């Protein structure tokens, strides 16, 4: 059905009005901007002063969304990089960088990306700010990185030169808020969505949030964006966005097929039926146990749950290994003739200690005590004799081949996983956690916590 010019203009007006109203809600006010700037400058000054006191050759700079003025109000995660000369050894970078970072904060925790950094907490102007203090090498050329984080200052410079004062900062905020409301903002393993830097590049490419959505609504698998036209990356991902400062890198490598598809669908929905609701973060409401039981009964499937204490590693490593374990366990289940419909992983923080959980939904979860074992063709005499020597009669013949019926070792999925889970390829940290103890049960027999309810809300598509 064709849309008249009048209707198109009316729709465009509504879209612009909604976006302008949302911008007013999510743009940091003057007070918030002044606080973030003051705190950032204070930390940088303290770091530089401490570096002199401690005899450390390093200086601090501000990077990320607060440096580029693209953060959403109330979401100011401050990133400060501590720049060391390129000739610094990896050991000195780690030891001196962490010592310097710890010296400016009373409350912090050590985290790990490509190398350790400090996640600090600062009380400032009656609120608490979270700040990442990241040691890196001050490389002169992004093609000569010594660690993955070394390219971030180049990202900073690239975006600031093209975004600052352009008026596009608010368009970036709109995109971030939109993605956040669909649970696909952030490149960490838990989400596998769109990073802040990727959002900035997409707006630089399309010049407005609405223009971006109109293009995204038409995306196909393998969509390729190369702002500088110098890309050398040849991977196979749903979305490829060449890094302007590193032509061999895909900025969108972390974006999963789900996140890619979710964005396309959300873009089409918003453009067709624009509403403020697309920008409203909703408090996640977990499914109750009774709701879950009703839905599960209607589906007619069975759910098996594997639970164990979550390894104490950074979230990205944890979820990467959980997904690896999920794939391996799923293969074990299917090798034993059970049929997996869907599966997923989560971490339940609604317990005394964080629990890692793998969930498997099954179409076939119980099997007969016997199974058919197909042998060689009767005409292959040498192989046939070996087969008959190895197995016990009776020998059946079907379609010209010998067949024997053998006793199935596991007739239900729970007994299989209780006995064979450790044989799976689980990843270093998950394997160690499994060794310390795990629980396998049907979902109806397990503890139904808030965390489980939140997982199934998303699993069933009710988010």
Report each predicted region and the residues it spans:
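Conserved nucleotidyltransferase catalytic core and NTase-mimicking acidic/glycine-rich helix/loop elements
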Residues: 167-353, 365-370
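Hydrophobic, small-residue-rich alpha-helical packing segments that form membrane-like cores
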Residues: 71-72, 76, 80-85, 132-166
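Short, polar/flexible loop-turn hinges at active-site or ligand-entry regions and domain interfaces
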Residues: 86-90, 107-108, 162-166, 187
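Short amphipathic alpha-helices in soluble, non-transmembrane regions
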Residues: 94-100, 372-377
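N-terminal regions immediately upstream of nucleotidyltransferase
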Residues: 1-75, 87-91, 121, 136-139, ...
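Conserved catalytic core of two-metal-ion nucleotidyltransferases
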Residues: 47, 95-146, 333, 339-358
């Amino acid at each position: 059905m064709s849309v008249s010019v009048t209707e198109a203009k009316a729709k465009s007006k509504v879209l612009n009005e909604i976006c302008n109203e949302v911008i007013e809600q999510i743009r940091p006010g003057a007070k918030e901007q002044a606080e973030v700037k003051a705190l950032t400058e204070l930390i940088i000054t303290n770091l530089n002063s401490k570096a002199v006191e401690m005899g450390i050759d390093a200086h601090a700079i501000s990077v990320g969304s607060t440096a580029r003025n693209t953060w959403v109000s109330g979401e100011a995660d401050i990133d400060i990089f501590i720049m060391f000369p390129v000739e610094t050894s990896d050991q000195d970078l780690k030891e001196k960088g962490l010592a310097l970072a710890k010296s400016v904060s009373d409350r912090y925790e050590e985290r790990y990306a490509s190398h350790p950094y400090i996640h600090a907490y600062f009380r400032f102007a009656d609120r608490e700010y979270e700040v990442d203090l990241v040691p890196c090498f001050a490389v002169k050329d992004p093609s000569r990185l010594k660690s993955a984080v070394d390219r971030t200052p180049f990202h900073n410079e690239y975006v600031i030169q093209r975004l600052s004062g352009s008026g596009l900062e608010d368009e970036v905020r709109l995109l971030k808020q939109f993605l956040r409301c669909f649970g696909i903002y952030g490149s960490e393993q838990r989400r596998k969505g769109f990073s802040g830097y990727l959002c900035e590049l997409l707006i630089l490419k399309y010049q407005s949030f609405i223009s971006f959505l109109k293009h995204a609504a038409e995306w196909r698998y393998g969509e390729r964006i190369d702002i500088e036209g110098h890309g050398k990356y040849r991977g196979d991902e749903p979305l490829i966005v060449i890094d302007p400062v590193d032509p061999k890198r895909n900025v969108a490598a972390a974006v999963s097929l789900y996140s890619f598809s979710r964005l396309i669908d959300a873009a089409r929905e918003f453009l067709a039926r624009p509403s403020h609701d697309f920008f409203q973060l909703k408090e996640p409401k977990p499914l109750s146990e009774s709701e879950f039981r009703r839905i599960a009964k209607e589906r007619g499937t069975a759910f098996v749950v594997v639970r164990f204490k979550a390894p104490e590693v950074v979230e990205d490593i944890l979820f990467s290994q959980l997904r690896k374990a999920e794939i391996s366990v799923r293969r074990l289940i299917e090798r034993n003739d059970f049929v997996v419909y869907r599966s997923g992983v989560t971490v339940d923080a609604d317990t005394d200690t964080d629990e890692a959980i793998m969930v498997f939904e099954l179409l076939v979860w119980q099997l007969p005590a016997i199974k058919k074992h197909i042998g060689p063709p009767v005409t292959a005499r040498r192989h046939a004799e070996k087969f008959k020597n190895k197995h016990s009669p009776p020998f059946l013949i079907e379609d010209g081949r010998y067949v024997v019926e053998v006793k199935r070792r596991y007739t239900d999925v729970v007994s299989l996983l209780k006995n064979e889970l450790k044989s799976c390829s689980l990843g270093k940290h998950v394997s160690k956690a499994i060794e310390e103890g795990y629980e396998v049960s049907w979902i109806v027999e397990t503890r139904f916590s808030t965390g489980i309810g939140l997982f199934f809300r998303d699993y069933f598509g009710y988010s």
